[in-house]
Amino acid sequence: GDILKKIYSKITKERRKQFQIETYIMKDGEQRLVVKRALAKDGVAHIRKMSDYYEKNKDEGILCPSKLISENEIAFEFLTGESLCNTMLEALEDKDEVRFLSLLRMYDGIIRSNVNIERRTFMPDAQFVQVFGEVSFPDEMECGKEMNIDMSFDNIIKDQTDSKYKIIDYEWVFSFPIPVKFVIYRAVSAFYTRNGSAMKDIMTINEIYDCFDITEEEIVIFENMNEAFNQYVY
């Protein structure tokens, strides 16, 4: 019989129709799966995109395995292990700045996997502008196509089964070029918003931005891009 059991569910109704999904955890015997389901016909393409991205990049071994289980549902393996975010917090708790910095360097490597990166003058194309608004940067910068912009430290988990770091969420991947630093900025600012107090006396947020050569001018532009992205989703 059908032994699939929903044990947790979260619905994003406040998004635009094509991005509205339910995320639920399902128990299939002993195995747990995280399922994302499109709430409307409009959302099927959004689900498909995640599956296509996984199929294209799965051989790198850095993405959490997933598969389409119906035309509007994608199921991800439920990975057990510690998130990069927690490991970073442990380093801060131990006041171990060296370890904290080495985790940031490792993160930098992870976000560069699966991506073709070029250094050039950034020229936003029409698709970019639709999502992130009109921007221009004074200097050449590294840009990548097929970037996953949701690479928060929470979304990277050290899989207990093989001790490899894996990305558990690839819902927001764009085919057009995006500055690599924008992805880093999003992760760092989200981390700081939630865990700023843990960083006290050890590192400031600006010191982290400095590690990645993110300038004050760039931060202002990235804030605007993020604002535009939220408008695009909601």
Describe each region flagged by the PLM.
Residues R32, E71-A75, D162-K164:
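A generic structural signal for beta-strand entry/edge sites
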Residues T121, D125-F128, S175-Y234:
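Helical subdomain adjoining the active site within ATP-dependent kinase catalytic cores
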Residues S9-L63, E77, L84-M88:
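ATP-binding glycine-rich loop module of kinase domains
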Residues F128-A198:
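Catalytic activation segment of kinase domains across protein kinase-like and atypical kinase folds
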Residues C64-G133:
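Conserved structural core of kinase catalytic domains
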Residues G1-D28, V129-E142, I219-Y234:
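Non-catalytic membrane-proximal stalk/linker segments that position and tether the catalytic domains
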Residues K27, L68-S70, K158, P179:
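Generic beta-strand structural signal
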Residues M50-G61, L103-E118, S136, Y209-F212:
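Hydrophobic, Leu/Ile/Phe/Ala-enriched alpha-helical segments that form helix-helix packing faces
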